[in-house]
A protein has these predicted regions:
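Aromatic "clamp/platform" in nucleotide-sugar-dependent glycosyltransferases that forms part
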Residues: 293
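Conserved acidic donor-binding segment of nucleotide-sugar-dependent glycosyltransferases
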Residues: 326-338, 346-350
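N-terminal strand-loop element at the rim of the active site
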Residues: 5-64, 149, 229-230
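A conserved mid-protein helix/loop that constitutes part of the nucleotide-sugar donor-binding site
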Residues: 13-21, 193, 197-216, 230-237
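Nucleotide-sugar donor phosphate/pyrophosphate-binding loop at the beta->alpha transition
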Residues: 63-67, 102-105, 112-135, 148
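Short alpha-helical donor nucleotide-sugar binding micro-motif in glycosyltransferases
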Residues: 73, 253-254, 260-263, 269-276, ...
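Carbohydrate-associated surface elements
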Residues: 145, 166
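Short hydrophobic beta-strand element within catalytic cores of glycosyltransferases
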Residues: 34, 310-314
Length: 391
């Protein structure tokens, strides 16, 4: 089966990293088109042997990109066109229809109750999205919560399929040696209780709540923020105002191509000067906190659970969709500093001697998600197909 993936950009981000990981587990002949910003993840996908094209789109209204995209689809003779993220879903669905491809799948990676990919959910955004959605066959939601939001928007229920994000579970297994190396690399005190926050440093992630909570806790509590974004300068200023100098580490992006390296490539035996990868950073932490009140899935928290970390969340559909008995290690916490401070204080006094991933993370093994996605492709692709039994 030949599949073209169209995505808005390929800089470092959750949807972009998820696409790269999924491509490594799909038994398809795949090509990728980035409308713009074919950055770090594009290079990583190409290194995996996948053909990547940068369409060079100059902006949301660069209509000249549309005929170029149509030509690519026609020349590739694809069985399925799969679009990712708002702009790519709109242009990709239109281009596929113009190229004569009706088997179009779109994944909705980041739809909240009040925003989509950081943009406010105005009537215009919704109308444009729904107009494009009608040109496709199936819209994939990364969680039941996103599926419910799509249906409330007006997407017919029969056109929505839930395929959760996935991770390579074993790559996130807790590693004591990696923990020691990473804590030394970050200059963390030996007895520090390290609280992590992973994600884009944007206002919606509410990492300010985590800093204000840390300011209420003893001096041995250190915050490690993994990611970058427009709120970083303000978060640095806030940390200084709160008297947290020396107790907050801004480590920048941890590019997922390190933990999602090629088979056989070891990322944890690398030179000590190399920046730690995400599994190493998670091993160095004692708890993971997500004060964001609105998430589409909560992939970073699943990765934290896979590392055996206790996680606190204000919103995490990935965890909320599980039975209570399967949520071991994950606890809901309202998105305010007092609540997070109280919850972290309780965790600080109860650090387990050993860390094991709860069984729940197996629900989000990437191979299972890839099998489910193949069944979506089979339902829309022309010709005889074989249903895949999820692993």
């Amino acid at each position: 089966m030949k599949v073209l993936h169209i995505i808005t950009g390929l800089g470092v981000g959750g949807a972009e990293q998820q696409l790269r990981l999924m491509l490594r587990h799909l038994p398809t002949d795949s090509d990728v088109v980035a409308l713009t910003n074919a950055g770090t993840v594009a290079q990583a996908i190409a290194a995996d042997g996948i053909r990547v094209t940068d369409l060079g789109m100059s902006g949301n209204r660069d209509l000249a990109a549309l005929p170029r995209l149509v030509r690519i689809i026609r020349a590739g003779r694809y069985d399925v066109v799969h679009t990712h993220l708002y702009r790519a879903c709109l242009y990709g669905r239109i281009a596929a229809r113009m190229a004569g491809v009706r088997a179009v799948v779109a994944t909705e990676h980041s739809l909240g109750d009040s925003q989509m990919e950081g943009r406010p959910l105005t009537a215009g955004v919704r109308a444009l999205y729904l107009a494009g959605e009608r040109l496709g066959r199936v819209t994939v939601a990364v969680s039941p919560a996103v599926g419910a939001r799509l249906h409330r928007w007006g997407v017919p229920r029969q056109r929505i399929r839930v395929v959760p994000n996935g991770i390579e579970v074993e790559r996130f297994r807790f590693d004591p040696a990696s923990r020691a190396r990473t804590r030394q690399h970050l200059g963390l005190p030996s007895g520090a209780f390290v609280v992590g926050g992973v994600g884009r440093l944007t206002a919606g992630k509410r990492f300010d709540v985590l800093l204000r909570a840390a300011a209420q806790l003893p001096a041995d509590v250190v915050v490690v923020l993994v990611g970058n974004g427009p709120e970083e300068p303000e978060l640095r200023r806030l940390a200084h105002r709160l008297g947290l100098d020396g107790r907050v580490r801004f480590v920048g992006e941890s590019t997922h191509e390190a933990p999602y390296a090629s088979p056989g490539e070891s990322t944890r035996e690398s030179d000590a000067a190399r920046a730690p990868d995400l599994p190493s950073l998670l091993s160095a932490m004692d708890a993971l906190a997500s004060p964001s009140p609105e998430e589409a899935f909560g992939l970073a928290l699943v990765e934290g659970l896979a590392s055996g970390l206790p996680v606190l969340y204000a919103s995490c559909p990935a965890v909320e969709g599980l039975d209570a008995a399967e949520r071991s290690g994950a606890a809901y916490c309202p998105s305010d500093p007092d609540s997070f401070a109280q919850a972290l204080h309780g965790l600080r006094g109860d650090v387990p001697p050993h860390r094991e991933a709860p069984a729940a993370v197996r629900h989000y093994c990437i191979s299972r998600s890839a099998d489910q996605l193949m069944n979506v492709y089979a339902s829309v692709a022309p010709g005889p197909t074989l249903e895949v039994t999820p692993r």
